[in-house]
Amino acid sequence: MKLAILTVLLLGAAVLCLGSKDADHSNSVGESHSSEAFISRQESASFARLKRSYGNNVGQGAAVGSPLESQREVCELNPDCDELADHIGFQEAYRRFYGPV
């Protein structure tokens, strides 16, 4: 028990000593650590390059993987078809609403 109390007191003293070092520093703008958080635009651009795509797929969505996927998306947009798809499956619901494909 005495060892635990002694350990806690020792750690508390260490925290007080280390904490008082930071309190001695001035918080002026020139010495502030927050000024180190900002870098110039040129420096930020040197490591944060964006991938650019020029005109190939502008305005187009991603290609649909399979015909079933496009049918599923059409069925999901119709609330009645979507509800029926929950009960009997989307292929059968799509067939009932939009006919055989």
Swiss-Prot record:
Residues annotated as domain Gla: 53-99
Residues involved in Ca(2+) 3 binding: 76, 82
GO biological process, any: type B pancreatic cell proliferation
Regions crossing the membrane: none
Cysteine disulfide links: 75-81
Domain of life: Eukaryota
In-chain residues carrying the UniProt-annotated modification 4-carboxyglutamate: 69, 73, 76
GO cellular component: extracellular region
Residue ranges annotated as propeptide in the record: 20-52
Post-translational modification note: Gamma-carboxyglutamate residues are formed by vitamin K dependent carboxylation by GGCX. These residues are essential for the binding of calcium.
Residues annotated to bind Ca(2+) 2: 73, 76
Binding site for Ca(2+) 1: 69
Extent of the signal sequence: 1-19
InterPro entries: GLA-like_dom_SF, GLA_domain, Osteocalcin, Osteocalcin/MGP
Compartments it resides in: Secreted
Gene Ontology MF annotations: calcium ion binding; hormone activity; hydroxyapatite binding; structural constituent of bone
Keywords: Biomineralization, Calcium, Cleavage on pair of basic residues, Disulfide bond, Gamma-carboxyglutamic acid, Hormone, Metal-binding, Secreted, Signal
Family: Belongs to the osteocalcin/matrix Gla protein family.
Function of the molecule: The carboxylated form is one of the main organic components of the bone matrix, which constitutes 1-2% of the total bone protein. The carboxylated form binds strongly to apatite and calcium.
Protein name according to UniProt: Osteocalcin
Organism of origin: Xenopus laevis
Upper classification of the organism: Eukaryota, Metazoa, Chordata, Craniata, Vertebrata
Gene name of the record: bglap
